[in-house]
């Protein structure tokens, strides 16, 4: 898997650092995944992991790692993971060039 296939922006990396520091756990990594569901067919998911699974691809921004499993990777290749703060609240988002349709909330897509 190409290590440049996904990008974690500086804003997203800074938020992960902030959350990692508040937990007091420097081993936490951001896991991004795709699951079935949502109004457009697929949904993005985010959580924190302390270990790398055998089928994970790793993407790095400074001292922050982002993990993507091999199934999700095929849907996320070329994507940019960012963190935004706005009127709808603060959240991680995925800018996915493979998505042909996205819903208004930005967390569901189709290919």
From Swiss-Prot:
Cofactor names: iron-sulfur cluster
GO molecular function, one term: 2 iron, 2 sulfur cluster binding
Binding-site list for iron-sulfur cluster: 39, 103, 105
Cystine residue pairs: none
Keyword annotations of the record: Iron, Iron-sulfur, Metal-binding
Free-text comment on the cofactor: Binds 1 iron-sulfur cluster per subunit.
Quaternary structure annotation from Swiss-Prot or TrEMBL: Homodimer.
Biological role: Required for insertion of 4Fe-4S clusters for at least IspG.
Name the UniProt record assigns to this protein: Iron-sulfur cluster insertion protein ErpA
Organism of this sequence: Acinetobacter baumannii (strain ATCC 17978 / DSM 105126 / CIP 53.77 / LMG 1025 / NCDC KC755 / 5377)
Name of the coding gene: erpA
């Amino acid at each position: 898997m190409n290590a440049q296939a996904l990008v974690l922006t500086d804003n997203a990396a800074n938020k992960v650092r902030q959350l990692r520091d508040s937990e007091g756990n420097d081993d936490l990594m951001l896991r991004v995944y795709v699951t079935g569901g949502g109004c457009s067919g697929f949904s993005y998911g985010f959580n924190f992991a302390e270990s790398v699974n055998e089928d994970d691809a790793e993407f790095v921004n400074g001292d922050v790692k982002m993990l993507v499993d091999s199934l999700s990777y095929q849907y996320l290749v070329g994507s940019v993971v960012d963190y935004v703060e706005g009127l709808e609240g603060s959240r991680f988002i995925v800018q996915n060039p493979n998505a042909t349709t996205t819903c208004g909330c930005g967390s569901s897509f189709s290919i």
